[in-house]
């Protein structure tokens, strides 16, 4: 079954926007604050953002086969993570612009340990969005624990900023 990419394009545009906004918010944090870890989350803010961006890049590589997304830089700075995420945004736009078969099986091999996975395109794409939402939420929790208000990165705020959503507050 071939999927329409239009719905996916909006979802992935939000994914890239939200991740980039969160990275931008963390650029103002000190090195000590970036090492903040909250119980129940993946780990320190910086490590979680690196993990999120690198996995996003890896998923693009697995799905597209484009070696430009075959990077592994676990020491990347936040500025480098931001650049990588912007590059991912271009990659997702290009990937989603072609006809996609949600049932096409994609084979993944982990270079570090040989782990292999076969999964349909539809599941891989859903996992990218789920993974991003989960880790952005964890970083927002850690930022909040520092007494800092995290950026508003929900879908409706994205839509408002992109001019795709209009809201009207009733008269009080």
Name every feature range the model reports, one short phrase each.
Residues 9-72, 112-172:
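Short, contiguous alpha-helical
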Residues 65-105:
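Helix-adjacent hinge/juxtasegments
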Residues 1-2:
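Short, Lys/Arg-enriched N-terminal segments with co-localized hydrophobic residues
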Residues 105-111:
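SAM-dependent methyltransferase
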């Amino acid at each position: 079954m071939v999927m329409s990419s239009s719905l996916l394009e909006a979802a992935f545009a939000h994914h890239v926007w939200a991740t980039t906004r969160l990275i931008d918010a963390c650029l103002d944090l000190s090195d000590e604050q970036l090492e903040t870890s909250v119980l129940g989350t993946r780990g320190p803010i910086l490590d979680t953002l690196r993990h999120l961006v690198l996995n996003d890049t890896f998923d693009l590589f697995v799905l597209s086969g484009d070696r430009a997304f075959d990077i592994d830089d676990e020491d990347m700075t936040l500025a480098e993570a931001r650049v990588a995420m912007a590059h991912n945004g271009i990659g997702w736009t290009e990937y989603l612009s072609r006809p996609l078969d949600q049932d096409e099986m994609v084979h993944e091999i982990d270079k570090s340990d040989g782990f292999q996975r076969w999964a349909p395109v539809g599941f891989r794409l859903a996992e990218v969005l789920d993974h991003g939402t989960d880790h952005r939420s964890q970083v927002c929790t850690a930022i909040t624990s520092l007494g800092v208000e995290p950026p508003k990165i929900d879908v409706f705020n994205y839509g408002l900023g992109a001019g795709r959503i209009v809201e009207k507050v009733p008269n009080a």
